[in-house]
Amino acid sequence: RNPFRHISLYADMAISTDRFNGDAEDLTNAPNTGFYYVRSTNRTVEMLRRWRAARSRFRPKAHDQEVFEAIKGEFVGGELQIKLVFLDTALFDGFCEYHGEMDRVCTMHANCCLRLVTKLHDLRNVVADWKRYSSLTPPEKMSSKLRWTYPAKCAATMKIPA
């Protein structure tokens, strides 16, 4: 499915979330910088420059997601007036806030999961699930109760955001 159909035309930046509270504009949503869309404008180019420069204000080797979480309000409420929207985890699913609805999801992200080997294991299950789902006829998809395989290996390592 094309994820871009679900990104607001009015957003300067749309970003996936680890936790989505139902309000796409609420800054208390937990952003995940593993998937984001930025409309190319002078303001968004400047936002990306400031995001990169802001890393120097944080501990050495701070992750870009940690930096973004701390400064996102500066972009929205500051001089840049960035229109930031958070993507619904029902469409942009991930292991943090797992929905399992194959008939709606556009992307699947192994967020909150530690260690590459566990991510790869559970993402391989996602690919196998998608192949099974994609092979069904439309009537079979409508009546199917197929869901994503629970990310069991990742669940054992979950780093759940506060």
Language-model segments: residues:
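GT-A fold catalytic core of metal-dependent nucleotide-sugar glycosyltransferases
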Residues: 1-31, 35-38, 45
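Catalytic core and acceptor-binding pocket of nucleotide-sugar-dependent glycosyltransferases
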Residues: 38-162
